[in-house]
Amino acid sequence: MSLQFNMIALLLVILILLGIFSHNSSITISAAVLLIMQQTLLAKYIPYLEKYGLSIGIVILTIGVLSPLVSGKIQLPGLSAFVSWKMFVAIAVGVFVAWLAGKGVPLMGEQPVLVTGLVIGTIIGVSFLGGIPVGPLIAAGILAVLIGKF
């Protein structure tokens, strides 16, 4: 088996480097796993990953979000906390962000090359504006709204 040098492999290497530079381990690990899969006999499993990967990832993310509640690190607030204006704003922001992420999923599927632009933007924001890396679904959702793909 020999290494395949193609544009996809080059893109994955660029994403790995951008992920390392921006301290975005999600991008680094994801691109590295896909590059290894592409370059080995694991390539036959890429269609399964393409079909089910996003759904599995969302389930794992949801488990991660809910686990502090189950472990007791976060307590459910009392009923009075739900009627405060801050709680209403928090719920509205949560709904809005979930809606944005939902808009990002189709965009990432239709135009996956835009993920590279999102990573470059993340690097600039982290490096020069003191930002932190955020999820690509929300960034893609914002992009989808801005370019009219919703």
UniProtKB/Swiss-Prot annotation:
It is found in: Cell membrane. GO terms for cellular component: plasma membrane. Keywords: Cell membrane, Membrane, Transmembrane, Transmembrane helix. It is a multi-pass membrane protein. Its main location: membrane. Coiled coil: none annotated. The chain crosses the membrane at residues 1-21, 52-72, 81-101, 128-148. Belongs to the UPF0756 family. This is UPF0756 membrane protein NT05HA_0561.
